[in-house]
């Protein structure tokens, strides 16, 4: 019974699905049918009727016939074929041949899409033809006005265009032929070709208008402004030469002739209507002329610099020489008291050598200024280099002088350090005396002797003449290590001795009961009396810990408490 119900449910499901699927497919057929009807009702005939208002000859007639044939084929052949395919689709559905129906629907949709594109193309091309005719008719009248205005300007102001006027006249005359060509193409119905003529004519007249606007200014530059600047440069050059300036290195006369030739080339470019080249050439000429002005101005400024700075630089050298002489005397005095490393002496000899070279170089420059055979700009460069070297040498000299002063300062610092280390050594001895130790271990006594000797070595170094500060510094470093190590060893030794003594006293309570403790403490006392405090502490701790674990911690706490009370 359950199987029967399952079969019935599956059958019902299949029937429902089949019904819904067929309904969906019929909706697709209805959509495609509506699309087909919408294409058939497109206003293509109305658009084609607009074309008939134009001259139906030549290119227009050919285009009209092509569009008409395309539309007739769509209406009479292609759309009826779509209708037949839709009918076949319905037949497949009625026979439940869903796969064939679905495939055919896809083909119909692709076909309608292609027809849609074809219809759009026809309408767009028609609109382009009609629009181009209307736009061309409007623009050609505007271009006629532009052309008339250009001819009037050329006629009225022909003199402002120089040699370019004839070629401008030729170009404007050729433009008139373009108007005639446009009229013939329009009359023949070749509206698209006529549109191309309009665009070419517009580009040509725009170009001519731009040229006619720029040529007068360019001619003014080449015929008036630039030649005037070259003449001014030539006059300025001659005046400066008469005033004693050396300008041979600038080659001004040859450069001015080259600029004059370049102006002639620019005028030729304008006459040939090579306006962009002419504009670039004028810009280059302006930049080159500005450079010439800058070069002459540079010589004037260099002359002012040389005249004003020469005395100041001479004073700088004199002052530096006097300072170097004082430093030389100071260095000789310092050498009697301090040992100067070879590198420092070599540095000072280098300063003296550079000083002589700078003085010699300055005298040579003075001679060249007096001879008046060298350009001021070159003299200025040399003086500026000289000033830079003087500044560098002043810095080196100052560093050397500060080094000499630092030697005495370093000596005082070294003596202060020696005093500090002596105090630290005395503090170590005071701690030993205060601790009332029975004696000093031999290693400690050796360290004490070593520390004293290191301090004596520093003192001896400080008394040497000349004083060798690097050697003093090395001796100071050795003494510092020795004294600090002794101080640390002193504190450690006193602590060990005090703890050993406390541990022995603490362990005395176990002497009678534990023979081993008695023996161990006797060994610790023996070591203590023989100044081996470290080993005595170790022996005492091991002994008391054997009978009372943790005893040493209590001894340490008692010892620390006593120390705090004493402080």
Swiss-Prot record:
A Pfam family: EzrA
Spans within the Extracellular topological domain: 1-2
Gene coding for it: ezrA
Function: Negative regulator of FtsZ ring formation; modulates the frequency and position of FtsZ ring formation. Inhibits FtsZ ring formation at polar sites. Interacts either with FtsZ or with one of its binding partners to promote depolymerization.
Location(s) in or outside the cell: Cell membrane
HAMAP family tied to this protein: EzrA
Record-stated family: Belongs to the EzrA family.
Keywords: Cell cycle, Cell division, Cell membrane, Coiled coil, Membrane, Septation, Transmembrane, Transmembrane helix
InterPro entries to which the protein is assigned, alphabetical: EzrA
Residue intervals passing through the bilayer: 3-21
Coiled coil: 97-158, 268-304, 346-497
RNA-binding found in the keyword field: no
Chief location: membrane
The protein, known as: Septation ring formation regulator EzrA
Membrane topology: Single-pass membrane protein
Classification lineage: Bacteria, Bacillati, Bacillota, Bacilli, Bacillales
Species, as recorded: Geobacillus thermodenitrificans (strain NG80-2)
GO BP of this protein: division septum assembly; septin ring assembly
